[in-house]
């Protein structure tokens, strides 16, 4: 994850010292298009900013986001200001930045480079990073449990409401795992990421999938691998597909080893009904192990009292229901995507056991795929993640939390029917 520490401290300070003026006078509409073009923000981030009411609130949201967008964000912002005829704002912050840079250089000459920094700005590689380098809980991970097979009786009882999933192999699976990153980028080695990759590869094979793995790909190489995979003619002969992306990330994207972003919407687009006809009406599963922000979930104390387990019902409206079957398909359907964490938050990883999310995912799928459909298994994964807590005594990350989630356009129950062979 490229967090707030990606931006130089004097760049952050220059923005902070001019924050009120920027919040009042910044004109964002065209500027944000330039920032997208420069690969600093994503379309999803623009939508999040535009959801705020009023230009001042939108500017504040943008200024909150900007320091988290990496080492190139400040210069890109200044260029975008000039390109959108807001030179007075660019000159203002550049003048402040020059003064701050000169002041810091003078202090470092006098006292050395070990100046104390605010916590959010400290990017020293020796400082334990929340999601990447610091082991947040104790102990080695257990071996992956064997996948339990479904029975012929279970298949017969549930096949009618489920996706057809009996091909051999069940489908093709692609894993893109980035662990090592370009040295000039502020993206650290993903210690424990190799455990995630090995765990998923073994799980998918045990579930009956033909697995392809690519390690340490640039953003362009990742997109190329996804495109080639989506166009494989073998998809026509199988019943499903799996894609897993394991890397650093931000909301709406995951990082290649070159520090550039692969936009998730572009990845999903490659597998939609328009671009991947061989997978039309077939379930497509995506699993994203990457941060979606840099906020640490500190958790809250649970109030005393019985835990609520039942949800109240709701009335269903029959208004505007379509009576006739359509011959056309929506552009995107039959997909389910599991995310390691919520929007804006960081994902946790243990340096020995791998990530919390992938560990929970492999455990639940191995144990429960014999008689539980994928959406319900992801609810069980959520439950395991909810109960987990960081273990890092003496650090700010002790007892931190994480919450996974999934989104779905599935139209039937997605049972994986592991081990079931028709006619046997």
UniProtKB/Swiss-Prot annotation:
Gene3D superfamilies cross-referenced by the UniProt entry: 3.40.50.1460, Caspase-like (3.30.70.1470), Death Domain, Fas (1.10.533.10)
Domain CARD: residue ranges: 7-96
Regions of compositional bias (Basic and acidic residues) in chain numbering: 296-310
One biological process term in Gene Ontology: positive regulation of apoptotic signaling pathway
Keywords, ordered alphabetically: Apoptosis, Hydrolase, Protease, Thiol protease, Zymogen
Catalytic activity: Strict requirement for an Asp residue at P1, with 316-Asp being essential for proteolytic activity and has a preferred cleavage sequence of Val-Asp-Val-Ala-Asp-|-
Active site (catalytic residues): 248, 291
Propeptide positions: 1-140
A GO term for molecular function: cysteine-type endopeptidase activity
Gene Ontology cellular-component annotations: cytoplasm; endopeptidase complex; nucleus
SMART domains registered for this protein in UniProt: CARD, CASc
Region (Disordered): 296-325
EC numbers: 3.4.22.55
Family, as annotated: Belongs to the peptidase C14A family.
Task of the protein: Involved in the activation cascade of caspases responsible for apoptosis execution. Might function by either activating some proteins required for cell death or inactivating proteins necessary for cell survival.
PANTHER family the UniProt entry points to: CASPASE 2, CASPASE RECRUITMENT DOMAIN-CONTAINING PROTEIN 18
Assembly behavior: Heterotetramer that consists of two anti-parallel arranged heterodimers, each one formed by a p18 subunit and a p12 subunit.
Name of this chain's protein: Caspase-2
Lineage: Eukaryota, Metazoa, Chordata, Craniata, Vertebrata
